Amino acid sequence: MQTFLVIIFMMVIGALIGGVTNVIAVKMLFHPFKTYYIFKKRVPFTPGLIPNRRKEIADKIGQVVEEHLLTEEVIQAKLNAPTSRDAIEEIIFKQIAKLKENHTTIQSLADIVDIDFSKTANQKLDELISDKMDNFYLDYQNTPIQQLIPNDIESSIDDKVALLPELLFDRARVYLKSEKGGADIASMLDTFFNEKGKIVGMLQMFMTKESIAERIQHELIRLTSHPKAKAIATQIIENEYATMKSKQLNELINETQYQAFKTSVTELALRYVDLEQTSHKPLHTIMPRFISFLETKVSKTLTDVIIDNASKHLSPIMKKINLRQMVEEQINTFDLAYIEKLIIDIANKELKLIMFLGFLLGGIIGLFQGVIAIFV
């Protein structure tokens, strides 16, 4: 009985020594958190292993993450994976679909950055039109009008000008044959007779005012069909047209006229565009075809562009981020108690197994020691 108690006692003592040793060893990984001194001498094993080697551990973890976990090759492979491509395209498609479902307007988007869109856009459009017109006027103010007109437009205008004499005579003939034309001739004849009294008296000895008016009307109508009259009118119109085309731009439109013209053009353009009203309309009502185009074409193309550009610029991005340093700095900011909790949460089973193994090995060693103590 005494022999059995000795063996059991030795086993218990060995188990306690082995188990407590391992428990202390595990605790010494983290504790103490700071260095202790006795008589200005540093107490051995203070601070604990992890607090003492914290910077080295952080550096090694950063190195492992940068060189083996989040490498350029790994990230590029993940970006080009079908699952990543589908996820990016789905996000883009959902964002485009939101434009159709909600009442997002240009102004509501501008409000995010505190911008009055219509006011700003009107100002920019006014400046753009004014600058373009000013540049054109300054560049071509000494250029003949004929050189500013495109050839096809000039040919079209030439054709219209060639028809102008016949058109004028046709309109004049219709007017002279009308009641208003006859009445206007009679009215002008009355005015003439009132101003030229003596001549009227002599004419009225041979003809009445009505017959004189009819004769004048008849001759004027005949004149509209006379070839010589047409030739004279044609020559005058062609000469004036040629003179106008040969004039320089600043001769046809002087500075004052140009400024007035520019103001009219910009005001007309701003009224036509009406950015105030347009900026408060939902985007899908302003450009429905563009939204459909985004859905059918742009979503896939934009996905490819995002992935391609991300892959191309991944190397400089990784260098600028400096993943190793970022991980190291982040770990160094962690509280030691948090690091302890983090490691214990990860390796809890293994640490408990180490402590249990200490009790087990200590007990086995104690058993052998007890047996040896009895029989030796």
From Swiss-Prot:
Lipid bilayer topology: Multi-pass membrane protein
Key words of the record: Cell membrane, Membrane, Transmembrane, Transmembrane helix
Keyword field contains Flavoprotein: no
Keyword Transmembrane: yes
Chain segments annotated as transmembrane: 4-24, 356-376
InterPro entries: DUF445 (IPR007383), UCP032178 (IPR016991)
Subcellular location: Cell membrane
Any Gene Ontology CC annotation: plasma membrane
Chief place of localization: membrane
Family of the protein in this entry: Belongs to the UPF0754 family.
Protein name per the record: UPF0754 membrane protein SSP0953
Provenance organism: Staphylococcus saprophyticus subsp. saprophyticus (strain ATCC 15305 / DSM 20229 / NCIMB 8711 / NCTC 7292 / S-41)
Taxonomic lineage of the native organism: Bacteria, Bacillati, Bacillota, Bacilli, Bacillales
